[in-house]
């Protein structure tokens, strides 16, 4: 899970 990638 990536946030602001």
Swiss-Prot record:
Keyword Secreted among record annotations? yes
Q: What subcellular compartments does it reside in?
A: Secreted
- Disulphide bonds annotated for this chain are none
Example GO CC term: the record gives: extracellular region
Lineage of the native species? Eukaryota, Metazoa, Chordata, Craniata, Vertebrata
GO BP terms: defense response
Q: What does the tissue specificity note say?
A: Expressed by the skin dorsal glands.
Record function comment:
Shows neither neuropeptide activity nor antibiotic activity.
What protein name does the entry list?
Answer: Rubellidin-2.1
Q: Which organism is it from?
A: Litoria rubella (Desert tree frog)
Keywords attached to this Swiss-Prot or TrEMBL record, sorted alphabetically, are:
Amphibian defense peptide, Secreted
